[in-house]
Design a protein with these regions (language model features):
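Acidic, surface-exposed loops and disordered segments
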Residues: 1-177
Length: 177
């Protein structure tokens, strides 16, 4: 059941040295390619990074919160073409990233994402500018997030869901505060 998979998925930032198989990576990306996009425009593209030196460099694309990428076996940059869907590219990429995270969990792999929007590189330039140079991207492309994937070297406790009655409303009126 999907709920079991959603409950199983945790943000994993520590990985073993075990390699993610090509078959697993292909399955993850095949699932991502099924992600819905607004008006089925499909502005989302994926860049796979496996080279350890490149992963180390990539882990510095923003201050502090992308360090886990250096320990991942593989990273997937979720990129959008802003000419295809300029008003929905961020949302389309977020849906695709969620599919990737769930697919990784289904394969007993660990994964988490690091967002790019409004992030700064340690040099002071935007993370987006750094990543454009890093990947040699045309201006029409935006890197939305980068997902590190590997075999988990940590276990996370079960996530306690948010309280249903405090977050779900049948009618707004004055209930939402």
């Amino acid at each position: 059941m999907l709920l079991d998979l959603v409950e199983k998925r945790r943000s994993i930032r520590k990985f073993t040295d075990e390699k993610v198989s090509e078959e697993d990576l292909r399955e993850i990306l095949t699932i991502a390619l099924h992600a819905p996009t607004a008006k089925n425009r499909n502005p989302v593209r994926y860049i796979i990074i496996r080279d350890k030196k490149r992963l180390e460099e990539l882990s510095n694309y923003k201050v502090n919160s992308a360090k886990f990428l250096a320990g991942a076996d593989v990273a997937i940059a979720v990129v959008t073409d802003s000419e295809i869907a300029p008003n929905t590219n961020h949302q389309d990429a977020s849906i695709a990233a969620t599919y990737i995270l769930l697919a990784a969990a289904d394969l007993d792999l660990g994964a988490t994402w690091a967002i790019v929007v409004d992030a700064k590189h340690e040099s002071g330039i935007s993370a987006q500018d750094f990543l454009h140079k890093f990947f040699d991207l045309e201006d029409k492309f935006d890197v939305e997030c980068i997902i590190g994937i590997g075999h988990p070297a940590e276990e996370k406790s079960e996530k306690v869901p948010f309280e249903y009655s405090e977050n779900v409303f049948e009618d707004l009126h004055d209930k939402l505060k």
